[in-house]
Regions:
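Phosphodiester-processing cores and adjacent nucleic acid-binding clamps
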Residues: 1-304
């Protein structure tokens, strides 16, 4: 493995473990922490999807490391599932259920030749209802940690949960104190602006990102960070350019993350197999255009 030395210490602020990112990441937090320490790291954030189940592992292993004379700081976080407004989503959901009832009636009519169902519109509505974006949240202090606990708990309540635990701007405003937030990955809030507007051109993407940035700064102030990542996905590099532009425009600080899903480079194949078990073959990776065999090397996967 090639290693680049730098005077600036890299601190991973976006990482996943098997403790909280089931069928997405492998390796318990202690394995991630050990690899980080062995490669000169002094701190690591754990940001599993929608939960903080890995926190006890972080705390216990950090105590073991300190007892062995290894100075290391665990950073507590979560990659939350975000939608702008649960209330607005609920209105959309109610409307969709009414449309679904009408659709069933329309299908019966269609069978008799009376009408034709608008299948495209139905699928579009389902897409909106299921849409959610990633948002990385990291505790800055004890107040932030307490607020993270509250946010995670709130996200699992019936009024917020739909397929996944979700939070919105209203909840973030209530519990934002002491929390650092960043825009996450290709599934993140800035990425959502990119995916939804890129066909309409450069300015459409930027305008959507401006709106997101204003809202996030309103919630977090200078604790809002623009996140870029480095992998082999073409769209990631396109997104990075937009993120850099928006950061410069608003004076938002940039952070670079690994978004790691396995504790060491050699574990990439194990993680790929684990993912496939979770999806039961329903989702074909981008590299698997022919057959279902694993790629020869990690570079063929595209990510991480």
């Amino acid at each position: 493995m090639n290693r680049t030395e730098s005077k600036i210490k890299f601190v991973g602020l976006h990482a996943h473990s098997v403790a909280g990112s089931i069928f997405d990441a492998i390796g318990f937090p202690n394995a991630h922490m050990d690899f980080c320490y062995q490669n000169g790291g002094e701190a690591l954030a754990l940001t599993d999807h929608g939960n903080m189940n890995g926190l006890p592992y972080q705390v216990l292993h950090c105590k073991e490391m300190l007892a062995a004379g290894k100075k290391f700081k665990p950073i507590f976080g979560c990659e939350a599932y975000f939608i702008p407004s649960v209330d607005e989503w609920r209105e959309e959901y109610t409307k969709a259920m009414e449309d679904k009832k009408r659709s069933r009636a329309a299908k019966k009519d269609a069978q008799s030749g009376a009408t034709i169902e608008d299948e495209g519109s139905s699928k579009k509505t389902q897409g909106i209802l299921r849409r959610r974006r990633h948002l990385v949240l990291v505790a800055q202090n004890q107040t932030g940690l307490n607020n993270l606990f509250k946010l995670v708990s709130e996200s699992y309540k019936a009024e917020n949960f739909y397929r996944y635990p979700r939070i919105d701007y209203k909840l973030l405003k209530k519990y934002s104190e002491g929390i650092i937030a960043s825009s996450a990955c290709l599934g993140g809030v800035y990425a959502g602006n990119y995916w939804e507007n890129r066909e309409d051109g450069d300015e459409a993407v930027m305008n959507a990102m401006r709106e997101t940035t204003k809202n996030m700064i309103d919630v977090f102030g200078d604790r809002w960070y623009a996140e870029i990542q480095w992998n082999n996905i073409k769209e990631q590099h396109e997104l990075n350019q937009y993120v850099i532009r928006i950061a410069k425009e608003f004076g938002v600080k940039l952070i670079s993350t690994a978004d790691s899903h396995y504790p060491n480079p050699e574990a990439w194949k194990d993680r790929e197999l684990y993912k496939r078990l979770g999806w039961l073959g329903k989702s074909k990776p981008s590299y698997a255009d022919e057959g279902s065999e694993l790629p020869a090397g990690v570079e063929e996967i595209g990510y991480e």
